[in-house]
UniProtKB/Swiss-Prot annotation:
Ubiquitously expressed. Present at highest levels in the brain, at high levels in the placenta and testis, at intermediate levels in the intestine, ovary, skeletal muscle and thymus and at lower levels in heart, kidney, liver, lung, pancreas, prostate and spleen. In the kidney, it is widely expressed in tubules, but sparsely expressed in the glomerulus. Expression is significantly increased in renal biopsy specimens from idiopathic FSGS. Overexpressed in many tumor types including breast, colorectal, endometrial, hepatic, kidney, lung, ovarian and pancreatic tumors. Required for cytokinesis. Essential for the structural integrity of the cleavage furrow and for completion of cleavage furrow ingression. Plays a role in bleb assembly during metaphase and anaphase of mitosis. May play a significant role in podocyte cell migration. GO terms for cellular component: actin cytoskeleton; actomyosin contractile ring; bleb; cell cortex; cytosol; midbody; nucleoplasm. It comes from Homo sapiens (Human). SUPFAM superfamilies: PH domain-like. Residues 1-230 are annotated as: Nuclear localization. The modification Phosphothreonine is found at residues 194, 320, 364, 397, 401. Residues 1-155 are annotated as: Interaction with CD2AP. This is Anillin. One of its GO terms (molecular function) is cadherin binding. The lineage of its organism: Eukaryota, Metazoa, Chordata, Craniata, Vertebrata. It comes from the Eukaryota.
């Protein structure tokens, strides 16, 4: 344990003993009521809302008074005060214990209202008693102020009393810490036989205060935020006290918010009174909205009174927002008192918050993880309650008595002589104002300010500050768990400044801070302090457990709290939207979208708080709010500094967002390193474009994949099915062509005509294709899909695929035949047909060419262009030449005339003749066309040739199988072009060895492998702007395979050797890199890569290019030299 903690523990023990001793010496009920009155004086002196503050101050002062005396000036003292709070917590625990009773009272229909009213009534009565006592002990001005405040309250009650009274009564116990304690007070007051008349008065006042809910929703939210901030960062003691009270009850958060805002106006009580009415409505309104949205969440998060109230009585949550309003009025009084004694009050408030939290947690059903710690406080509280049972009504009065006196004296002294302190605080306040203005300068156009008129300035600043404060508390909360004492000090200073400064802007700032720090944050901090107080050894463990418990409870309670928040928030939205409903919804949606990323990473506390709110507004689902704590903290800081309102603020005060806030995402200002880092982290989260470095790419795998893709493993069954379908189609074509030919019985019916020749052509093509398909099918059945992979290349590199194109086909005829056909054109018709076959799937037939129309000189020309795609280098294309002779019978016409004269042709005779002749022409033998084929084609094969890669470069090919008496000359002319589908490319720096004036030098070059050449430049940018310095043509390479250079000759690492040959020139001479042999100049190229991997990659790609060149363009390159 560090020495600082040990000091705190020692001081805590001493204070505890002192407090217990003083408590034993104190009177019971009467002095406690006096204490309450004194506390009420303090808030009255500072704030206009005295009555609510009395209750809240009683709670706050209960713990802090002893601790404040000791630790009013020290932040450490506050931590110790938290420990000292245990005795105070006993009282506050009592108050919390009554809060469970308050749920019991609430079930009673009339009693709920009366009790809730009784709470303010008891507070009012106590305040009145306190007023009289204050007159005795303090300046009469305080009493006068309290009376004025009470009168003003009555006026508000008379003006604002509405149907909200029952709600207020219901809310009162839950929302404010004072109210949380107040419901127990009514019970206690009942137990103590509190007069009915007094109850009635208090009920009326409570109803009036509750009726303010509609007007005070936004201000109430602000108060909530104020409490949250002190709870989180413990920056201001007021806020810490209010935060603690907020822990006890979400209403207490409201009270603290009001308290903080009023504390700012403490310097001028009258002004504060007048402004408190307006602020009460505005601040309470914001508080109510924030508490509505926040307080349930806070109660859930902190697992304090709000949570316990939810578990005990679900009505308490709705009540919470209203009671915070009431308590918010009373809190200003406490704020005033605390502002006078800022350090002591901050400590007191913080201690109270901690105690109340512990009490609430002990009573809270959801605080299971914190239970052992809470049980300890509960036991102590029970002991104190046994010692002073009369405390029930005044609760904290006895504890406050000794400390309260000192605090009151300090407050009066501060009122009388606040020159030095006041000036210092004013300076601080001015600085805070400047910061608030800077942080919220984009929110100047808030709808809040426009609506509230006179308070527009204060409201704008408040909203601005709320926006910033929401972020700052989160940031502060980050460091709260680590250094609790420091946040406490910050809070105290901040709260002191606003307390002394009567301007509403500091109020808004403090409120904003409290609001921002969300109850969960406060709870975490307070619980940590409590754990420190309770035990020194298990302190760290308890901290962790408490935090975990809180998080779990927040998640569990989000459902219940979200429901309540939705109900409460609906009213706020109705009030806030009015004419701006549509614009606000659009703004909220736009803001939600723009800030969704930022708000996703809110603190755990803010997550729990915002989840229900997000559900209400429909911004983001609670699940989306979950994120790691680091991200939450970072994003929180960024969102805090951004001018646009956060989710929390937006939901509470939807109207407070200006139109400019829509584009606020673009103007996010990064005030801190955290914000910058979070932004940078967000950027890294986005999917970045991965830059592929070619030199590190494994080309072998790609090449293998590419090569294996062509002999793809097609499903055998599917392939066989396709072949069968194609065979059936060809069978149909064969049958139809045969039937057509059978009809050509004479010249009148197409015999010897072009149609008959076309039918013969179709029959020939279909028959040949069917035969090829059957052969392919049989191969598939016998050999399977591995047939194509049998001829695997011997070398390591697979040659690339290519395309083959055949064009300009010419078929020369014999000169004698050409002359005879010209002389006797009517003797016969000669038709020629060329079929190109490259497997069963690639079969193309040229159109019919006859000597009458296609003869060009002594050769027949065919315009067909045949192209094969994606063929390997071992392709084979079969060329087959067919001819058909249609001889004309000169006596045919005479015979036809005779028959027509002798016998008329009737349909019956025609049918008989066709049948007879078709039977004559039909073939009895099995036809290649299939079983259903009637006949075979009359085309005869007169020549054939097989083309391969070796045929490339030739245009004249000798036909095989040419008959001796054929009309063909025996040759065929065609153009064959092969194109390699090689896309091997590489770019990178290589160091090339060159001869410079007889000396070897290595020069770094930017080399590009494209096509068959390696081109190199000095810089990469020169590739597109300049001609290359030099080229190495791989077609001239004589190296059988490119390999690493021999280290005996080249000592440079990662070097490979490339030997090229070119014809010798006259000016060639031998150098270090080139030698002349016979008529050739041999150049040895050494290229060095930066790494071994790069060298291997270059070698692989160069070898691939060489393979493709040598296989596809054998005549275009030199034959390799060396061992095969």
């Amino acid at each position: 344990m560090d020495p600082f903690t040990e000091k705190l523990l020692e001081r805590t023990r001493a204070r505890r003993e002192n407090l217990q001793r003083k408590m034993a010496e104190r009177p019971t009920a009467a002095p406690r009521s006096m204490t309450h009155a004194k506390r009420a004086r303090q808030p009255l002196s500072e704030a206009s809302n005295q009555q609510p503050l009395s209750g809240g101050e009683e709670k706050s002062c209960t713990k802090p008074s002893p601790s404040k005396k000791r630790c009013s000036d020290n932040t450490e003292v506050e931590v110790s005060n938290l420990e000292n709070k245990q005795p105070v917590e006993s009282t506050s625990a009592k108050s919390c214990s009554p809060s469970p009773v308050s749920p019991q009272v609430q079930p009673q229909a009339a009693d709920t209202i009366s009790d809730s009213v009784a709470v303010p009534a008891s507070l009012l009565g106590m305040r009145r008693g306190l007023n009289s006592r204050l007159e005795a002990t303090a300046a009469s001005s305080v009493k006068t102020r309290m009376q004025k405040l009470a009168e003003q309250r009555r006026r508000w009650d008379n003006d604002d009393m509405t149907d909200d009274i029952p709600e207020s009564s219901l809310f009162s116990p839950m929302p404010s810490e004072e109210k949380a304690a107040s419901p127990p007070r009514p019970l206690l007051s009942n137990a103590s036989a509190t007069p009915v008349g007094r109850r009635g008065r208090l009920a009326n006042l409570a109803a009036t205060i509750c009726s303010w809910e509609d007007d005070v929703n936004h201000s109430f939210a602000k108060q909530n935020s104020v409490q949250e901030q002190p709870g989180t960062a413990c920056l201001s003691k007021f806020s810490s006290a209010s935060g603690a009270s907020a822990r006890i009850n979400s209403s207490s958060v409201k009270q603290e918010a009001t308290f903080c805002s009023q504390r700012d106006g403490d310097a001028s009580l009258n002004k504060a009174l007048s402004s408190s009415a307006d602020d009460a409505s505005l601040v309470n309104a914001s508080i109510s909205s924030s508490v509505k949205a926040t307080s349930p969440v806070k109660s859930t998060t902190s697992i304090t009174d709000a949570k316990s109230c939810e578990g005990q009585n679900p009505e308490l949550l709705p009540k919470t927002p209203i009671s915070p309003l009431k308590t918010g009025v009373s809190k200003p009084i406490v704020k005033s008192t605390l502002s006078q004694t800022v350090p002591s009050k901050g400590e007191l408030s913080r201690e109270i918050c901690l105690q109340s939290q512990s009490k609430d947690k002990s009573t809270t059903p959801g605080g299971t993880g914190i239970k052992p710690f809470l049980e300890r406080f509960g036991e102590r509280c029970q002991e104190h309650s046994k010692e002073s049972p009369a405390r029930s009504t005044p609760h904290r009065t006895p504890i406050i008595t000794p400390n309260t006196k000192a605090i009151q004296e300090r407050l009066f002294k501060q009122d009388t002589s606040s020159s030095t302190t006041h000036l210092a605080q004013q300076l601080k306040q001015e600085r805070q104002k400047e910061l608030a203005c800077l942080r919220g300068r984009f929110d100047k156009g808030n709808i809040w300010s426009a609506e509230k008129g006179g308070n527009s300035k204060s409201k704008q600043l408040e909203t601005k500050q709320e926006t910033h404060c929401q972020s700052t508390p989160l940031k502060k909360h980050q460091g709260v768990s680590k250094t609790q004492s420091l946040p406490v000090t910050e809070k105290v200073t901040e709260n002191q400044i606003p307390a002394k400064n009567s301007s509403t802007e500091p109020k808004g700032f403090t409120e904003c801070e409290m609001t921002k720090s969300s109850p969960l944050k406060i709870t975490l901090f307070l619980e940590e302090d409590k754990s420190l107080k309770v035990t020194s050894d298990p302190k760290v463990e308890q901290k962790i457990e408490v935090i975990r418990e809180i998080e779990m409870s927040v998640d569990d309670d989000d459902i219940n709290s979200s429901k309540v928040i939705n109900d409460l928030f609906s009213d706020v939205l109705e009030e806030g939207e009015l004419d701006m409903e549509k614009s606000q919804e659009e703004m909220d949606q736009a803001l939600a979208e723009s800030s969704e990323e930022q708000e996703d990473a809110l603190n755990i506390s803010s997550m729990s708080l915002l989840a229900p709110l997000a559900q209400t507004v429909g911004v983001v689902s609670p699940e989306s709010l979950v994120s790691t704590p680091r991200l939450e903290l970072k994003d929180t800081s960024r969102s805090d500094e951004s001018p646009k309102p956060g989710k929390f603020q937006r939901t509470r005060v939807p109207r407070a967002e200006s139109g400019d806030s829509l584009g606020s995402e673009d103007r996010d200002l990064l005030y801190s390193i955290d914000a910058y880092r979070s932004q940078r982290f967000k950027e890294t989260e986005r999917p970045s474009i991965k830059q592929v470095i070619v030199r590190k790419e494994d080309v072998t795998s790609k090449l293998d994949e590419k090569n294996n893709a062509f002999p793809c493993q097609v499903n055998i069954k599917q392939k066989m099915q396709e072949l069968n379908n194609e065979i059936n189609m060809q069978q149909t074509v064969i049958y139809q062509a045969s039937q057509a030919l059978n009809c050509c019985v004479d010249e009148e019916h197409g015999k010897g005509s072009l149609e008959e020749a076309e039918a013969e052509r179709l029959l020939l093509i279909a028959t040949g294709k069917r035969t090829l398909l059957i052969d392919e099918l049989n191969k598939l059945k016998n050999e399977g899909p591995q047939r194509k992979n049998k001829a695997s290349p011997q070398s390591e590199f697979m040659p690339s695929k290519g395309s083959v194109t055949l064009s300009e086909i010419r078929l020369p005829l014999k000169a004698d035949f050409v002359c005879s056909t010209v002389q006797k054109p009517d003797a016969a018709n000669y038709y020629y047909l060329i079929i190109l076959k490259a497997g069963a799937e690639n079969m193309v037939a040229t159109p019919l060419a006859s000597t009458s129309n296609s003869l060009n000189g002594d050769a027949l020309t065919f315009t067909t262009t045949f192209t094969l795609q994606d063929v390997s280098n071992d392709f084979e294309i079969n060329i087959e030449v067919y001819s058909l002779v249609q001889k004309k019978d000169p006596s045919g016409l005479d015979k036809k005339k005779k028959t027509s004269k002798s016998k008329a042709i009737t349909p019956k005779r025609l049918l008989t003749s066709i049948t007879t002749k078709s039977n004559i022409h039909s073939s009895v033998m099995a036809s290649p066309g299939g079983l259903s084929a009637v006949r075979t084609s009359n085309f005869a094969l007169v020549g054939s040739y097989t083309l391969s890669l070796s045929s490339v470069g030739n245009t004249k090919f000798v036909l095989d199988k040419v008959p001796f008496l054929s009309s063909l000359e025996g040759h065929i002319y065609l153009k064959i072009k092969c194109q390699v589908n090689s896309s091997v490319e590489e770019r990178g720096f290589l160091t090339i060895f060159e001869d410079v004036s007889g000396f070897g030098a290595w020069h770094r070059r930017w080399c590009v492998l494209s096509g068959n050449c390696i081109s190199y430049w000095t810089y990469p940018d020169d590739e597109k702007r300049k001609n290359p310095i030099g080229r190495i043509n791989l077609a001239n390479c004589t190296s059988r395979q490119i390999e690493p250079a021999n280290r005996e000759f080249c000592a440079r690492r990662n070097t490979f050797e490339l030997i090229t040959v070119r014809p010798q020139r006259e000016d060639d001479r031998e150098t270090l890199v080139s030698q002349c042999r016979d008529t050739l100049c041999v150049t040895k190229n050494w290229l060095s890569a930066d790494t071994k991997e790069e060298r291997d990659l270059w070698m692989q790609k160069l070898n691939q290019v060489l393979v493709d060149i040598r296989l596809w363009q054998p005549d275009a390159c030199y034959k390799p030299i060396g061992k095969p």
